[in-house]
């Protein structure tokens, strides 16, 4: 029986073939003087060229040139130039296979290369096992083996043997992981784990299925449901430390595999595998339920405040008519009194003319009942929500263990006291109850003349706990999301090791004195320059008069001729169904190979079924309706393919491949240089079951929803997307997309643009630390204050805009902390959004958050000065953000079904919707980019196409793409590797384009 191939043809080529890019060829195939001397001893040009190429192949990738193999022309040309022969002479060498075999044997001996054999394979298998415990991806394991072969001087094995070795080692690694997870489990623990697959009493549902149904809506019943499930998990008594015996990504993979398998299948696993999977599920559910409980806690307390504020506002509105009547009455009385005084009249008689005295006295008493405190404090009605909070709060406090920084000690004592009172059924607070945590706004409600108000005290404890959890001052044992701030960062010891070795991975001078002196010189000079130009009226489209900043808005820069050209080009693009477009793009890029099976690593057996699943996500159609609208798969087939092949990491790999292909298209260089990007959030309403898991942002109206936050390159490639709450700050997520896309090496001086939602001083600071130029379009710039090192009076024109001096001492005191935060983000120890969320939630007196904000003020001031002085920067920012808005219009058109609403309840399904949408949008952009290039070429054959107009072209059009109807594939439309053909263009419209 033949070996079943798992690695795709493209993956094998990447592993075994020489590089074809110029940089890779130079790196691997530059010959030394000794190499040239040996090669020149060959007989004839063809022998010398063949010998040189064989030498190159044996060094990298580490195998001989095969019989019948024709090397890449770029490689042949590069080597031929070095040995001073013609590339065409290779043909004579390749026709005589005896020369190839003889050269291969001689060079293997010269280089000391060993052949692949059973002993070598066994040694490499033992070596690979450690890596297989870290990653399960077959292509990654194969790449590691080949790299080790090169290091050990071993000839690369045939692809089939390499696959077999990796599969065997992967199986060994899985068995080892199962052993580590189950070793030491008691008989009672094993019995309780097995009970998870049994049915619950009087139901047809298993315990495991019930545990997986985690309540999402912010209701007291949901909180109690989460706590009930968590107590059931804790009763199994699996030590969380057991999960640290294996790599966390492998633990997560076990959980994902089990999540795509029925409970009956899990119950049928052999004993050790079954207990390992159930242990992994137990550990994962414990953390997920803990995080969900804290999330519900935050939402329930937040809802309490919103309801109180809403009730307060409604009451005020209800009293508005009475208040208005009183104001009008007192205005008349005031006018009568003023007239009486002017005419030396009797003021009381004047009042009687307006309203009888007795009635006037009544209106005064009525007015007193309408009077409210100046701040209209909604806390006055919070106590009315106490009964609802008590439905779940005692169980919540009893279930979780909270720990905190020393500053939260008073709050920790208060929680412990309430926990004890709830347990004992006590209703009266002791006189010694901790109150140091009570903030001034709460004090007048909590600390009354009659003592401590129990209701307000408990509400204050919960509100303060919510704020401290968000800030990271308090953390929860067993939580992933709500961990201690220190635990999220790279350790101080590791940071010191990095500093002593190769240096920490930040983009600025790490010596603070040198850093701040450079910034001081720079900022002083820029302030002086801009101040002088502003004083002389030399800032283009900018005036500063009496401290008031005015900037002339950017005018539309796209000429009508460019719009006409775009319309003509799009009119020639072939009309195409979205199914055919996706098939064609898959043929160009092979992106479907990225959607590998979760367990086996194999590509999908039927690409059409996989594409149907992707379209179900991206078009917002859903699997059920997709099964009805396509003829190639049942709902069961679609669901199986989606469960095992479509997930976050495969979406990310496929998107990266599409983005790379689109960015390499020659036409894409006209859209941008590749050194800039932008990001923006797009709101989608929630419908159906998705409403309970969504939030209301008044900016988008009264309906709940969520946002897809997407990053777009200046070449129109949407390289990252993330689902965020409708109320979430976009600034928290700016850096995540950049870091995920660029990895460890951001392009030098990469400029990133956002609108006002992405702006914060913390983002300015971290962008500078991590090597990005942050260039947002700051709203209400005239109200944003600048900062300086010198006295503001040194810059008289800008002085009204300068709020004060930069606190250098504060930045200096916490410089090591700022470098540690940046290093933790750069190394992937923690995401930027998590750090920024905690820093933003800190009280203003937190020194680290304040120091980062101070650094951000410095960077924002430098940027603002550039913004005022450079109209080109303002135009670029507007242009890049317009690209994002255009992309959002395309996304809105693609996300056409279900009224464009998000109706998924779970966050995982919502993420799949966002990823599927972004993948389809990117595929359309890539398809448009390639076909627009063909359209330009065709148009130039009949008329002049000014290059100045092409700069305004974009690949965002979609009128030619059929996004609705039946989704049809046929056998001859399936994608094939190395597909190169393009569809014929439509006739060119009979119009002439003129240069602007």
Regions found by a protein language model. Give the residues of each.
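Acidic, metal-coordinating catalytic cores used for nucleic-acid/nucleotide bond scission
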Residues: 751-762, 779-785
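Long, compositionally biased intrinsically disordered regions
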Residues: 800-996
